[in-house]
């Protein structure tokens, strides 16, 4: 694609949310308890920092996704609401202990850690992330841990250092189809993400590898199908597919609102490729991650799915 070419066709931005994107906000006592538990530890969560539309749902279930290595990112992706910085603070050596204390208070059995990209650090922050995970293993030995990691700028040694911690799920999102990647993701490449996923799958063949994409960014149906095939071909086992929702006017506009029927179709396409697909308008990488983990684990032992309603 040349500099003069537009990465997406020019289309009018949808004026209103369709009915399937309207939901009740389940606020209440449990939500308030989760909010207080997290904020009392001074911990950032991707739920808040990325303005996730599912925050009230997840916090009302006593679940949250912790954001490691700070609350500001060294990349400025066009879809993401996390703050950008060129000079982030050093990693907090007590972060693992703070997360462990919070996870204990919430009674978490499946802990999800995501991270900001730390291109300022030699290993992309892998060592700091490993320290957090090792602390969690010590403090909550029966809990399973899922990590949504950056691409570490393609640093395979950093990836292996992370995988040696025996996490339950390694998650790295391709985010969108290959054609739109330069427009959607800052400093990341589609092929490098596939390379990291494939390397993880080969390094630990029994590891649950996971990735996710957003739709509604201007992608074509054929491109989504190709992305699912690419992920399957590179060793991914679990894929989440959700509707892109614009956090603010300074972010990439929504090109289309994808119907629930289309999500069902994408799920059937992915399942035909052997993938475990969790798809729906509000699905995000870590949305209902505990249930997805249990459903995947049971699928691997040939039992029925326990997934909650995807909407």
Swiss-Prot record:
Keyword annotations of the record: 4Fe-4S, Cytoplasm, Iron, Iron-sulfur, Metal-binding, S-adenosyl-L-methionine, Transferase
Pathway(s) served: Protein modification; protein lipoylation via endogenous pathway; protein N(6)-(lipoyl)lysine from octanoyl-[acyl-carrier-protein]: step 2/2
Domain Radical SAM core, chain residue ranges per copy: 59-276
Positions bound to [4Fe-4S] cluster 1: 47, 52, 58, 286
Keyword Iron-sulfur belongs to the record: yes
Region forming the signal peptide: none
Cross-referenced Pfam families: LIAS_N, Radical_SAM
InterPro entries, A to Z: Aldolase_TIM (IPR013785), Elp3/MiaA/NifB-like_rSAM (IPR006638), LIAS_N (IPR031691), Lipoyl_synth (IPR003698), rSAM (IPR007197)
Major location category of this protein: cytoplasm
Gene3D superfamilies: Aldolase class I (3.20.20.70)
NCBIfam families: lipA, PRK05481.1, PRK12928.1
Protein name from the UniProt record: Lipoyl synthase
Organism name: Chlamydia trachomatis serovar L2 (strain ATCC VR-902B / DSM 19102 / 434/Bu)
Highest classification ranks of the organism: Bacteria, Pseudomonadati, Chlamydiota, Chlamydiia, Chlamydiales
């Amino acid at each position: 694609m040349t500099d003069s070419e537009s990465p997406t066709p020019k289309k009018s931005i949808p004026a209103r949310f369709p009915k399937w994107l309207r939901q009740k906000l389940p606020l209440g006592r449990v939500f308030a308890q989760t909010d207080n538990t997290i904020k009392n530890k001074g911990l950032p969560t991707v739920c808040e920092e990325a303005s996730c539309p599912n925050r009230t749902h997840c916090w009302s279930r006593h679940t949250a996704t912790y954001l490691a290595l700070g609350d500001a990112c060294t990349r400025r992706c066009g879809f993401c609401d996390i703050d950008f910085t060129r000079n982030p603070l050093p990693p907090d050596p007590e972060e693992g202990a703070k997360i462990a204390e919070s996870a204990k208070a919430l009674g978490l059995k499946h802990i999800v850690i995501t991270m900001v990209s730390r291109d300022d650090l030699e290993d992309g922050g892998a060592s700091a992330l490993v320290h957090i995970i090792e602390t969690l293993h010590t403090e909550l030995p029966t809990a399973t841990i899922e990590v949504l990691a950056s691409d570490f700028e393609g640093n395979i040694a950093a990836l292996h250092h992370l995988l040696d911690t025996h996490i339950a799920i390694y998650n790295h999102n391709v985010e969108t189809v290959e054609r739109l990647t330069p427009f959607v993701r800052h400093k990341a490449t589609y092929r490098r993400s596939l390379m990291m996923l494939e390397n993880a799958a080969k390094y630990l063949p029994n590891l649950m590898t996971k990735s996710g994409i957003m739709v509604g960014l201007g992608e074509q149906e054929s491109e989504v199908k190709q992305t699912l095939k690419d992920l399957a071909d590179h060793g991914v086992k679990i894929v989440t597919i959700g509707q892109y929702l614009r956090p603010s006017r300074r972010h990439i506009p929504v090109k289309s609102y994808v119907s629930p029927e289309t999500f069902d179709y994408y799920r059937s396409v992915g399942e035909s490729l052997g993938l475990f697909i969790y798809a729906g308008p509000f699905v995000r990488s870590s949305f209902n991650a505990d249930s997805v983990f249990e459903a995947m684990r049971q699928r691997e032992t040939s039992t029925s799915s326990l997934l909650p309603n995807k909407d």
